[in-house]
UniProtKB/Swiss-Prot annotation:
SUPFAM superfamilies: a domain/subunit of cytochrome bc1 complex (Ubiquinol-cytochrome c reductase)
Lineage, highest ranks first: Eukaryota, Viridiplantae, Streptophyta, Zygnematophyceae, Zygnematophycidae
Keyword Transmembrane listed: yes
Species, as recorded: Spirogyra maxima
Protein name per its UniProtKB record: Cytochrome b6-f complex subunit 4
Biological process (GO), any one: photosynthetic electron transport chain
Similarity comment: Belongs to the cytochrome b family. PetD subfamily.
Source superkingdom: Eukaryota
Subcellular location: Plastid, Chloroplast thylakoid membrane
Keyword DNA-binding: no
Gene from which this protein is expressed: petD
Assembly behavior: The 4 large subunits of the cytochrome b6-f complex are cytochrome b6, subunit IV (17 kDa polypeptide, petD), cytochrome f and the Rieske protein, while the 4 small subunits are petG, petL, petM and petN. The complex functions as a dimer.
């Protein structure tokens, strides 16, 4: 096992180097400007060039080409819009439907404040927030599944 020599902090040469910020690792290569100005832009440009090259050389079709003369019977939104689409579909009044759609993010904003005084992170020790979360999840799943069905079976999911 080798003996390591500890630095002598009373040495005036070492103190001068430490005052300049050179320390014991003054022989290394600094990150600025070498890495930040030369290596990082090359890596970023290379990544972008690879992505553009792959997109140009091998374009992939996303879905099937649209045919404006053959539209589907019922146009559905993307899957993450199914619950609010179902709200709009089932509520007869348009203004009420839009207000209910606006109530979804407003309700999500109020969930953290339900048990503001309760500082526990364990969901079993926060019964109100856990109940609201589970109820909202069940309602969102119910509305999402119902939006994929025809309008006459959408509220009951074809079960009743």
């Amino acid at each position: 096992m080798g003996v390591t020599k500890k630095p002598d902090l009373t040495d005036p040469v070492l103190r001068a180097k430490l005052a300049k910020g050179m320390g014991h690792n003054y022989y290394g290569e600094p990150a600025w400007p070498n890495d930040l100005l030369y290596i990082f832009p090359v890596v970023i440009f290379g990544t972008i060039a690879c992505n553009v090259g792959l997109a140009v050389l091998e374009p992939s079709m996303i879905g099937e080409p649209a045919n404006p003369f053959a539209t589907p019977l019922e146009i559905l939104p993307e899957w993450y819009f199914f619950p609010v689409f179902q709200i709009l579909r089932t509520v007869p009044n348009k203004l009420l439907g839009v207000l209910l759609m606006a109530a979804v993010p407003a309700g999500l904003l109020t969930v953290p404040f339900l048990e503001n005084v309760n500082k526990f992170q364990n969901p079993f020790r926060r019964p109100v927030a856990t109940t609201v979360f589970l109820f909202g999840t069940v309602v969102a799943l119910w509305l999402g599944i119902g939006a994929a069905l025809p309008i006459d079976k959408s509220l009951t999911l074809g079960l009743f």
